[in-house]
């Protein structure tokens, strides 16, 4: 009879280790779960630390970038300001110093020649750019250079000499207001209009 009791004891002893083992396995699983949660927490902490580090690193660089953009904008504004003052503002015709109306040397060659031809002044034309170029050794061999010598009647003169002749004639010329003012008004009103002639049959 002791044998069956022993068998029960063995079965109980066998059952106890299995239960204990079962408990042990459950305990090990819970430990593993706890370790996994701890690892997850550590990973989350590491991610938070990395994000904090990235934020800390991005802070100065972003501000540095904004400061760089501001400095670039200021430099561009200064460049544009200098460009306007140098190349745009100074080239405006209203800002240029206007010459005196009686300074005939400032007038163009075409105007002086038209004035001479209109009033039929006994004075030759002034030298052009080609005439000045004839002053070289190569230009001295041309016909135009020989024509401009002192012995010829149609020699060219300098622009300054022609301007002096035109100024003296203008000072000595008597102006009639009854003839000058109507012509001036007519020219101002019709300076940009083209002459049109209509034929009606």
From Swiss-Prot:
GO terms for cellular component: histone deacetylase complex; nucleus; Rpd3L complex; Rpd3L-Expanded complex. Belongs to the SAP30 family. Component of the RPD3C(L) complex composed of at least ASH1, CTI6, DEP1, PHO23, RPD3, RXT2, RXT3, SAP30, SDS3, SIN3, UME1 and UME6. Present with 704 molecules/cell in log phase SD medium. The gene is SAP30. Component of the RPD3C(L) histone deacetylase complex (HDAC) responsible for the deacetylation of lysine residues on the N-terminal part of the core histones (H2A, H2B, H3 and H4). Histone deacetylation gives a tag for epigenetic repression and plays an important role in transcriptional regulation, cell cycle progression and developmental events. GO terms for biological process: cellular response to heat; negative regulation of rDNA heterochromatin formation; negative regulation of silent mating-type cassette heterochromatin formation; negative regulation of transcription by RNA polymerase I; nucleosome assembly; positive regulation of invasive growth in response to glucose limitation; positive regulation of transcription by RNA polymerase II; regulation of DNA-templated transcription. PANTHER family: HISTONE DEACETYLASE COMPLEX SUBUNIT SAP30L-RELATED (PTHR13286:SF6), SAP30 (PTHR13286). Residues 1-10, 60-70 have a biased composition (Polar residues). This is Transcriptional regulatory protein SAP30. The keyword Transcription applies. InterPro entries: His_deAcase_SAP30/SAP30L, SAP30_C_sf, SAP30_Sin3-bd. Residues 25-59 have a biased composition (Low complexity). The keyword Zinc-finger does not apply. It holds the Pfam family SAP30_Sin3_bdg. Residues 1-70 are annotated as: Disordered. It comes from the Eukaryota. It is found in: Nucleus. GO terms for molecular function: transcription coregulator activity; transcription corepressor activity. Keywords: Chromatin regulator, Nucleus, Repressor, Transcription, Transcription regulation.
């Amino acid at each position: 009879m002791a044998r069956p009791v022993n068998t029960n004891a063995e079965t109980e002893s066998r059952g106890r280790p299995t239960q204990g083992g079962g408990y042990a396995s459950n305990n090990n699983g819970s430990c593993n779960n706890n370790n996994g949660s701890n690892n997850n927490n550590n990973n989350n902490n590491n991610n938070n630390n990395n994000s904090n580090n990235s934020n800390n690193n991005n802070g100065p660089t972003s501000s540095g970038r904004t400061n760089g953009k501001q400095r670039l904008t200021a430099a561009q504004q200064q460049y544009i300001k200098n460009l306007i003052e140098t190349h745009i503002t100074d080239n405006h015709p209203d800002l240029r110093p206007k010459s005196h109306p009686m300074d005939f040397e400032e007038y163009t060659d075409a105007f002086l020649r038209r004035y001479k031809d209109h009033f039929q002044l006994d004075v030759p034309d002034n030298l052009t750019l080609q005439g000045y170029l004839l002053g070289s050794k190569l230009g001295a061999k041309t016909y135009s250079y020989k024509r401009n010598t002192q012995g010829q009647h149609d020699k060219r003169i300098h622009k300054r000499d022609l301007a002096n002749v035109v100024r003296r004639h203008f000072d000595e010329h008597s102006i009639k207001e009854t003839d000058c003012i109507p012509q001036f008004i007519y020219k101002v009103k019709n300076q940009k209009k083209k002459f049109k002639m209509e034929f009606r049959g």
